[in-house]
Amino acid sequence: MDTEYYQPSDFSIGHRGACMQFPEHTLESYAAAAVQGAGIIECDVTFTADTELVCRHAQCDLHTTTNVVVTELNAKCSTPFVEGSGVAPVCCTSDFTLAEIKTLCAKMDSSGSINGTAEEYVYGGTADWRTDLYQFECPRVPTHKESIELIGSKGAKFTPELKTPSVEMPFNGVYTQEDYAQQMIDEYIEAGVDPSQVWPQSFLHDDVFYWIANTDFGDQAVALDDNYTSTADGFIPLFDRLVENGVKIVAPPMQRLVEYDETAELLMVESEYAKEAKARGLDIITWTLERTGPGLSGFYWESTADLDKVEGDKFNLLHVLAFDVGILGIFSDWPATVTFFANCFDVKLVGDAKTCLTDAEIAALPNTVAVDALTSQNHVSLGPRPFWLVDEMRDNAIKTTLGTSMLVIS
């Protein structure tokens, strides 16, 4: 299948790596995101009992993202798993030292019944459109520093999110929120990473204001928006406060940026939220494509609930976001989908690979194209999913353009 004829794109952001199929926030997941052409890759940052920084989506998710409850460390969890109790466990990074966390195996973010055994709880519940295939070799929980090393080695850029603490701050009475925010930035400084390569994020906007006021990493700091109202009364005051404090980028979930319009060619149009943000000079990043199972319903698709959607509508959404809204980039659980789109429409590509070949150029390709994408920074392997999604599209000009890039090499 396709390899060197696609290139990475900074429009394509690896959400927790490539966590549709790889255990989130593992080096394996980050490597998979790089192979799929994510130009920017995310580490969600939280801290351990000894205030070391590790990559986890939440401070208290170890019970669903690792095997901790089947180990002796279960006893140290904030709420240990007790078989037969019917009580859900809660295991936090701050319950353990870094050395202890490094003994755990990461896994797909899921859980079975709390009424079963510890093994059934740990290894149950993975959605059937995901997979457990890549979790049984015991991938480890990476430190933030390890994520910087791995992501940088793949030629990708960085978007760390400082996770909101689940414990009282200052932690242990001494480790303040500002200490935490500064420590994350310091690890990029120590690694020699230029600020232009980093988009630090937080839902706590005081963190973003801190980076702007106190570090060289504030110019691309991202204010995540979890105020999901679609009314102007909800988002205009937010935009004004961000601008007043020097913020340049806001990041809402993707459904806030589009609305259903049965008269539009792609059946989606730019939302008032997007228009108002841009009117105030804010750039936009959004999240998260490929987070939803078959059917395209629920949270991420609620603003187009009246549209009878097909799987291929993901590409129509991407086109509206890229060319009508004008977003900087989009997080995806499977970056290959976004990378494929970005190559076809020349969106924020990185490198010199040739893309969207003509029929004549495709016919001239060699029968075999072999690239070790895992060890090469600039070669991309997308796999079959983007091509399947094209097949699932409605007939329109977007499908025609994407179809010219379906390189299946025998």
Where are the language model's segments positioned?
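Phosphate-group recognition and catalysis centered on beta-loop-alpha active-site segments
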Residues: 1-395, 406
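Low-complexity intrinsically disordered segments
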Residues: 395-401
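N-terminal signal peptide
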Residues: 404-410
